[in-house]
């Protein structure tokens, strides 16, 4: 579908429901604004526009008559595309979230293992410091005792967490088995 131009400006609203729906997504809209703000992208857009004006614009009047024959099919494809985007909106509501929220969620998900490792390291150092303070013995022997007792404390915490996790999974499995037996 041709978009009318006035003084070289393309109208901001395309005639396609699919494209309007697609441009309503914050991620796509922000991406387009970012590309338009980039000077290299502006040069590419100008080059593409000049190629369009040179090669495609003179041919468009000749394609008007054949376009009349295919326009119902184009409109139907546009309608199907818009309905598909509606289903995507229902199934994946995250596509409507603002770009900054998507960025922050993705960043926190990617950095989750790193942050947990930092927390674990800090916890072990805190346990070691408290064990070294409890022992009150200076020197290499005191540090060795603090290291061994830190290993015991951290192992005990890990086994306690694992025990509670497995107990919850065992209870969950027991209820599933009981439900299967009743059926």
Curated annotation (Swiss-Prot):
Induction of its expression: Predominantly expressed when Metarhizium robertsii is engaged in accumulating lipids.
Compartments where located: Lipid droplet
Traits of the deletion mutant: Leads to thinner hyphae, fewer lipid droplets (particularly in appressoria) and a decrease in total lipids. Reduces dramatically turgor generation by appressoria and subsequent ability to breach insect cuticle.
Record keywords: Lipid droplet, Virulence
Chief location bin: other
Role of this protein: Lipid droplet coating protein that regulates lipid metabolism, appressorial turgor pressure, and virulence. Appressorial turgor pressure is important for breaching the insect cuticle during infection.
Family statement: Belongs to the perilipin family.
Protein name: Lipid droplet coating protein mpl1
Organism per entry: Metarhizium robertsii (strain ARSEF 23 / ATCC MYA-3075)
């Amino acid at each position: 579908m041709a978009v009318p131009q006035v003084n070289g400006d393309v109208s901001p609203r395309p005639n396609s429901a699919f494209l309007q729906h697609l441009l309503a997504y914050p991620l796509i809209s922000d991406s387009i604004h970012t590309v338009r703000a980039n000077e290299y992208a502006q040069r590419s857009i100008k080059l593409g526009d000049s190629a369009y004006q040179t090669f495609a614009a003179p041919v468009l009047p000749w394609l008007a008559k054949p376009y009349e024959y295919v326009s119902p099919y184009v409109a139907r494809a546009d309608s199907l595309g818009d309905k598909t985007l509606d289903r995507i909106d229902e199934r994946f509501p995250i596509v409507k979230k603002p770009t900054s929220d998507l960025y922050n969620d993705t960043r926190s998900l990617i950095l989750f293992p790193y942050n947990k490792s930092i927390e674990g390291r800090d916890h072990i150092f805190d346990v070691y410091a408290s064990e070294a303070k409890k022992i009150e013995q200076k020197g290499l022997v005191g540090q060795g005792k603090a290291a061994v007792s830190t290993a015991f404390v951290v192992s005990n915490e890990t086994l306690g967490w694992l025990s509670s996790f497995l107990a919850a999974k065992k209870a969950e499995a027991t209820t599933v088995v009981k439900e299967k037996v009743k059926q």
